[in-house]
């Protein structure tokens, strides 16, 4: 029975396979891409063919090559932003969960206030402060504005764990916050962190795509899936459906696969259903 319960469904297997293929292909973009990401040619707005499997855009650039290189940027920013937001949420949520009630209310009140503000506006404001956009600045802007919901999940888990006998004993023996976090709290809320971290990767990629579509993402010379969609705004008017359809399918498919993987993590730990 347990083996059947833990067996991955076909949807999850397909998601893992898709993410593996996308990740490896993006990582090996310099080896797999038939052309440079910004290399122009005479074939303008050419439909998918033997020379250009995914077609070309209005500047004669190979779409397959740009998707491969764009995947590196989108996945990199998604992973970096998720790591930043997860780190902030772990510390913030743990402190809130272990603090006195009035401190906990104040910290969660601030998190709720931040959560009520449109993330995209805060990211744009931070980008204006950082100046020139780049992988690090975008990841920081998205990461420091995407931790609030995750912090509340972790806080709820910590409040539950803190009442256990072993945590109470560790506190009575003078155990530091860092020791209790490392030895007792982290193993207890790790499943919740894993679910939230996986979900935040997709959210960060979506935010980056939105910024790039608005022209507020990476510089023009850098390619991301969001910038590909931004460049394809006039594609349908010229009948070049592949310029918007193929990158859109790749981005949406990747986001769905990440969401399915996160859902599998949530289902794998039934205790998370009450807090998520």
Regions found by a protein language model. Name each.
Residues 56-61, 98-99, 169-179, 183-188, ...:
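Short helix-to-coil transition segments within interhelical loops
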Residues 134, 145, 191, 198-199, ...:
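C-terminal transmembrane helix and the adjacent membrane-cytosol boundary/short C-terminal tail
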